[in-house]
Regions:
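Intrinsically disordered, low-complexity polar regions and short flexible loop motifs
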Residues: 1-199
């Protein structure tokens, strides 16, 4: 009787703003895993091989094979682990400043649901290539609590385990005095109770 193959759970998020990578094909070794994967979209969690070496290739949309890859990355995932992999950075630096290199940023210990029933777990990732080191401040519920401190580009700030309420967040520079951007985060309105998500 053959032993079952070891697997890991993986979600891939396309966050590369490079126009050359506005949509890509994702290969697992030579097999097409995700076809025409668009910027700012996420795959579902899927089973991936664990405890073996494999290559992820990123190719232009409508590629014909893994040989068309513009970037490749080698992995060996831990069995029974859950990962989020975010594609970030710039493929071709022309016209971009700053232009951090294209990379796949891996987070182990990802969640497919909130760890506490009734909450919403939010994994914070700083994926803006031209934003400074930032703080994230919540103003609607907590009255100004800093919920993420000094996150730099490509950093995962870990999970926020939040009551499922409607929040307003401000992204500020690392001094905490200059607001870069404000966002509504209506977790309750969107029905995200018990969910885990990445922002």
């Amino acid at each position: 009787i053959p032993l079952p193959e070891s697997t890991a759970r993986v979600q891939v998020i396309h966050n590369s703003p490079d126009a050359l990578a506005s949509a890509v094909d994702v290969y697992l070794n030579d097999a097409l895993l995700i076809d025409d994967f668009a910027f700012r979209t996420a795959s579902p969690f899927i089973d991936a091989p664990a405890a073996v070496d494999f290559t992820v290739g990123i190719a232009p949309a409508n590629s014909t094979s893994s040989a068309d890859a513009i970037a490749t990355f080698d992995y060996n995932l831990a069995a029974n682990e859950t990962y989020i992999i975010v594609a970030s950075g710039i493929v071709n630096a022309a016209g971009y400043n700053p232009a951090p290199a294209f990379n796949l940023e891996v987070f182990a210990g990802a969640r497919e649901a909130a760890s506490t029933q009734g909450n919403t777990d939010v994994l914070v990732y700083h994926g803006s290539t031209d934003a400074p080191t930032v703080d994230v401040v919540e103003t609607a519920v907590t009255g100004g609590a800093t919920i993420v401190d000094n996150a730099s580009y490509s950093d995962y700030a870990g999970y926020l385990e939040l009551a499922t309420l409607d929040y307003r967040i401000e992204v500020r520079d690392e001094t905490g005095t200059v607001t870069v951007k404000s966002y509504e985060a209506p977790l309750n309105t969107l029905g995200l109770q018990d969910a885990a998500l990445t922002v």
